[in-house]
Amino acid sequence: MTRPAVIQPGTADTYAHQALALIAQHRLLTSTQLHQMLMPHTPPRKIHKVLAPLRAEGLIAHTALGVRSGLKAHFLTAAGAQVAADWPELRGRAATVIASPTAASMRAAHTLAGVRAHLAFLTEARERGDEYQPLDWMPEVTHRLPDTGGQDRLTADAVLHYTATQPRRLQYRAFVEIDRTTMSSERLARKLITYARFHDYTPQPAGRRGTAADQNAALSAWQRFYPRFPRILFILTGAPRATLTARITDLRRMAADHGLVTRLASHVPLGAAILEDLEEAGPSGPVWTPLAGTGERRGWTHL
């Protein structure tokens, strides 16, 4: 009996699919970043052959990054978002359509700083043989927070899902906050209060007054999404080292002085690192300052 031929998509089609999925999830990616994620062991020019048909079909567009640099950041068009909307790897993640190259350029600095951090984790995972893929960094994850005094939602810049395979198999999750020093240090530190409230928040059963038994039986809000509360990582860039170090000190002070955050720190690893250190030494290098306890720097899994 003759078996029917199995039709496999060509390599070019597979790369095009993956590139569109990556742009859909990460919002904005440079050609270099796409090359690092998708085909790091091939000549850089090959990524342009992947992107050209997507651009010709109107699925992606780009914005120039600086007048002299020649760098471009690619983003999804409405047509591209429609194509990728039902893909399994993007399920539950509505693709963000950026209206124009101007709109893309205005959000590029923050978005691409996050991608740089993601690539630091991805590069190290590949070197170590850990399980962490280009889609394991999920940008702009939002959770509703009814009890936060008007700030009714928590939006993390990203959530990462990482599985270390050596010396034993361990799964890690982290909320990631990217700080480019565009907000005050106090406002940055206040994000810890929002995370602490999310950690403590237990929704009341609808239509019930909430007896002690009900409260004990109810899940905390975060347990609806995570088996363990993710560690919280602040990644700073965009200013002299002295400024970034001072902001990390302010984060540590918030963890020490605010009772709600102090309680969070007793249950959840909290740390901060400078992006350039992260890129140079890798996430497992001694680049993370714990936000509670001793300030001795360490790797992110040892916070």
Please give the residue ranges for each predicted region.
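Nuclease-adjacent, charged terminal/linker segments that flank catalytic cores
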Residues: 1-102
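Electrostatic, structured charged patches in enzyme active sites and in nucleic-acid/phosphate-binding
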Residues: 2-17, 100-303
